[in-house]
Swiss-Prot record:
GO molecular function: rRNA binding; structural constituent of ribosome
Subunit structure: Part of the 30S ribosomal subunit. Contacts proteins S3 and S10.
Protein name per the record: Small ribosomal subunit protein uS14
One CC-aspect GO term: small ribosomal subunit
Organism encoding this protein: Chlamydia trachomatis serovar D (strain ATCC VR-885 / DSM 19411 / UW-3/Cx)
Function: Binds 16S rRNA, required for the assembly of 30S particles and may also be responsible for determining the conformation of the 16S rRNA at the A site.
GO biological-process terms attached to the record: translation
Family: Belongs to the universal ribosomal protein uS14 family.
Keywords on record: Ribonucleoprotein, Ribosomal protein, RNA-binding, rRNA-binding
Length: 101
């Protein structure tokens, strides 16, 4: 089980990213736009740099919904490989069966 503080930090980051996503996207669009003056682009880059680092989506890390484990994460099921194996063997995940050929 992951530390509660690490999971809480990740939840906090997700909220920050969600709250600032639109503003960040607009600033990035301005900074990359060639139709805007160089001064305007520079202001947009500075504004992006002044924003909190935790508002960037690249700071997010996928975690298991059940345990909070950051490694061995399976995107399709949003759980770690360990939880997946346990749940699959118990038949808790619909449509997942042990392979045999």
């Amino acid at each position: 089980m992951a530390k509660k503080s690490a999971v809480a930090r990740e939840v906090k980051r997700r909220k920050l990213v969600e709250a600032n996503f639109q503003k960040r996207a607009e600033l990035r669009k301005l900074a990359k736009s060639l139709s805007v003056s160089e001064e305007e682009r520079e202001r947009a880059r500075e504004a992006l740099n002044k924003m909190r680092r935790d508002t960037s989506p690249s700071r997010l890390h996928n975690r298991c919904l059940l345990t909070g484990r950051p490694r061995g994460y399976l995107r399709k099921f949003a759980i770690s490989r360990i939880c997946f194996r346990q749940m699959a063997s118990m038949g808790d995940i619909p449509g997942v069966v042990k392979a045999s050929w």
